[in-house]
Amino acid sequence: MDYRKSHLHPDKGESYSALFTNNPYRNMVWQFEKSFLDSILTLFYRNSDIHHLDFACGTGRILSYLEDRTKSSTGVDLSPVMLEVARKNIKRADIIEEDLTQNDVLGDRKFNLITAFRFFPNAEAELRMQAMHVLSRHLEENGYIVFNNHLNTGSTINRLIKFVGRRGFKGMSIAEVKNLLSKNHLEIVKVFHICVLPASEDRMIFPLSLLRHVERFLAGIPVLRNLALNLVFVCKHECS
């Protein structure tokens, strides 16, 4: 199935948005992702005006979290049902319904913060490349692209799935992430990680309070990064 068509069902927007509140594991991950975003703003944008583009913004989760700390915020998505929910969640961000990989309506606009969450590992390889090409073109010289790979194929849970003889899930390997960035002349400057333990949205092997505590500890150990299910990459243009 073309990933472009995956979020067009009339009920998709509300049901997708509810997962981040109603599913304990996904909600836990979202709390960690918010803390990562806080750290990124502190590390890279202290005393700077932020002009933010959220690509594949969906229901506006990232936009609504960041918009009070940005000079300008723009969200782009091709799904009208997702954007219907986004418009309820945001206060002042601009919303554009478009597929930038096929019709780049942003023209020559530049942004110093571009985010793209829960998009790249779900998208087909060709779509990934098209999307990153567009985003790199709209990134200011000293700006950063922040995106996540929430389906790291080298994660602990995927390794265990394969170990017991089942087919692992589709997603992206870290090597694929690096290749995608290299081909678009981008380099990684910071990586955050979470979800090292083999838990999932459907099966929690530990009580949530314990899982949260342990994952917070494991998130501070860089050597475990390759085993994490969810990695957040901070990237910039390659130095010439």
Task: Please identify what each model-predicted range represents.
Residues 1-45, 48-56:
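Conserved class I S-adenosyl-L-methionine
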Residues 59-102:
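Class I SAM-dependent methyltransferase SAM/SAH-binding core
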Residues 115:
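A conserved beta-strand element that flanks and buttresses the S-adenosyl-L-methionine
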Residues 129-141:
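A short glycine-rich, Lys/Arg-flanked "PGG" loop and its adjoining helix->strand segment in the class I
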Residues 142-149:
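Conserved beta-strand signature within the Rossmann-like core of class I S-adenosyl-L-methionine
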Residues 150-168:
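Short, glycine-/aromatic-enriched active-site segment of Class I SAM-dependent methyltransferases
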Residues 190-240:
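A C-terminal cap/extension of S-adenosyl-L-methionine-dependent methyltransferases
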